[in-house]
């Protein structure tokens, strides 16, 4: 059975592959030796850059507290520099949800059961 880190790493790769199939240039940002990284994936399409953090969840409620401080700081800086709103790609129950970061910040948590599914995936 895979541990949380392995499950997360698999989802990050899966998400990059899905974006590439959708016509994006997508790149996984490898963590530094200390494990820190600003976010997991940067992608571009039609001249617009996007950033994503990838999370897996076994619970339907996804809280802002799942983001690390360095990720929040990076998302905030991205917005200040004029980037498109960052998203958290959450994989829950074999579905991927794209959660708008500013909404997550405003509301504190999101109930995935009420969200639009971005992609269904097979295990």
Regions found by a protein language model. Give the residues of each.
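Acidic-basic catalytic patches of nuclease active cores, encompassing PD-(D/E)XK
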Residues: 1-32
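Conserved catalytic cores of phosphodiester-cleaving nucleases, focusing on short active-site segments
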Residues: 19, 41-43, 47-60
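Active-site metal-binding core of divalent-cation-utilizing nuclease and nuclease-like domains
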Residues: 25-47
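Short, conserved beta-strand edge motifs with alternating hydrophobic and charged residues
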Residues: 29, 51-54, 89
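Short connector loops at helix/strand junctions that flank enzyme active sites
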Residues: 36-38, 47-51, 70, 81-83
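Active-site-adjacent loop/helix micro-motif of nuclease/hydrolase catalytic cores
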Residues: 58-72
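Nucleic-acid nuclease catalytic cores
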Residues: 76-104
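Intrinsically disordered, low-complexity terminal regions enriched in charged/polar residues
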Residues: 97-123
